[in-house]
Amino acid sequence: MELGLSWIFLLAILKGVQCEVQLVESGGGLVQPGRSLRLSCAASGFTFDDYAMHWVRQAPGKGLEWVSGISWNSGSIGYADSVKGRFTISRDNAKNSLYLQMNSLRAEDTALYYCAKD
């Protein structure tokens, strides 16, 4: 009986680790106004192409602001008015990755950028 409980406990731990959602952003930096940056987000722990994905940001001292979103198959894409025409969201389902190409950067784009799943 004691051995059986140990195995159940071990399986529960392994299942929890396997299902842990991880979203790891990269590509940020310090650039002059007018320049470009490309952000990447590597996803794991879930079936990436089952979900719409989003970029949100938080400027210093402010709340979260939605920046852009993309459907699972890239068929539907949306942007906040503040970035429309300058930012481009894309995804590569084969690589479980989300991207944000940011052009013509402005001082007001200074923020922490996060990717998020639906």
Curated annotation (Swiss-Prot):
<keyword id="KW-0964">Secreted</keyword>
<dbReference type="GO" id="GO:0006955">
    <property type="term" value="P:immune response"/>
</dbReference>
<dbReference type="InterPro" id="IPR013783">
    <property type="entry name" value="Ig-like_fold"/>
</dbReference>
<keyword id="KW-1064">Adaptive immunity</keyword>
<keyword id="KW-0472">Membrane</keyword>
<feature type="region of interest" description="Complementarity-determining-2">
    <location>
        <begin position="70"/>
        <end position="77"/>
    </location>
</feature>
<feature type="region of interest" description="Framework-2">
    <location>
        <begin position="53"/>
        <end position="69"/>
    </location>
</feature>
<keyword id="KW-0393">Immunoglobulin domain</keyword>
<dbReference type="GO" id="GO:0005576">
    <property type="term" value="C:extracellular region"/>
</dbReference>
<dbReference type="InterPro" id="IPR036179">
    <property type="entry name" value="Ig-like_dom_sf"/>
</dbReference>
<feature type="region of interest" description="Framework-3">
    <location>
        <begin position="78"/>
        <end position="115"/>
    </location>
</feature>
<feature type="domain" description="Ig-like">
    <location>
        <begin position="20"/>
        <end position="118"/>
    </location>
</feature>
<dbReference type="Pfam" id="PF07686">
    <property type="entry name" value="V-set"/>
</dbReference>
<dbReference type="GO" id="GO:0003823">
    <property type="term" value="F:antigen binding"/>
</dbReference>
<dbReference type="InterPro" id="IPR007110">
    <property type="entry name" value="Ig-like_dom"/>
</dbReference>
<feature type="region of interest" description="Complementarity-determining-3">
    <location>
        <begin position="116"/>
        <end position="118"/>
    </location>
</feature>
<protein>
    <recommendedName>
        <fullName>Immunoglobulin heavy variable 3-9</fullName>
    </recommendedName>
</protein>
<keyword id="KW-1015">Disulfide bond</keyword>
<keyword id="KW-0732">Signal</keyword>
<comment type="function">
    <text>V region of the variable domain of immunoglobulin heavy chains that participates in the antigen recognition. Immunoglobulins, also known as antibodies, are membrane-bound or secreted glycoproteins produced by B lymphocytes. In the recognition phase of humoral immunity, the membrane-bound immunoglobulins serve as receptors which, upon binding of a specific antigen, trigger the clonal expansion and differentiation of B lymphocytes into immunoglobulins-secreting plasma cells.</text>
</comment>
<keyword id="KW-1003">Cell membrane</keyword>
<dbReference type="GO" id="GO:0005886">
    <property type="term" value="C:plasma membrane"/>
</dbReference>
<keyword id="KW-1280">Immunoglobulin</keyword>
<dbReference type="GO" id="GO:0016064">
    <property type="term" value="P:immunoglobulin mediated immune response"/>
</dbReference>
<feature type="signal peptide">
    <location>
        <begin position="1"/>
        <end position="19"/>
    </location>
</feature>
<dbReference type="InterPro" id="IPR013106">
    <property type="entry name" value="Ig_V-set"/>
</dbReference>
<dbReference type="InterPro" id="IPR050199">
    <property type="entry name" value="IgHV"/>
</dbReference>
<dbReference type="GO" id="GO:0070062">
    <property type="term" value="C:extracellular exosome"/>
</dbReference>
<dbReference type="GO" id="GO:0019814">
    <property type="term" value="C:immunoglobulin complex"/>
</dbReference>
<feature type="region of interest" description="Framework-1">
    <location>
        <begin position="20"/>
        <end position="44"/>
    </location>
</feature>
<feature type="region of interest" description="Complementarity-determining-1">
    <location>
        <begin position="45"/>
        <end position="52"/>
    </location>
</feature>
<comment type="subunit">
    <text>Immunoglobulins are composed of two identical heavy chains and two identical light chains; disulfide-linked.</text>
</comment>
<feature type="disulfide bond">
    <location>
        <begin position="41"/>
        <end position="115"/>
    </location>
</feature>
<keyword id="KW-0391">Immunity</keyword>
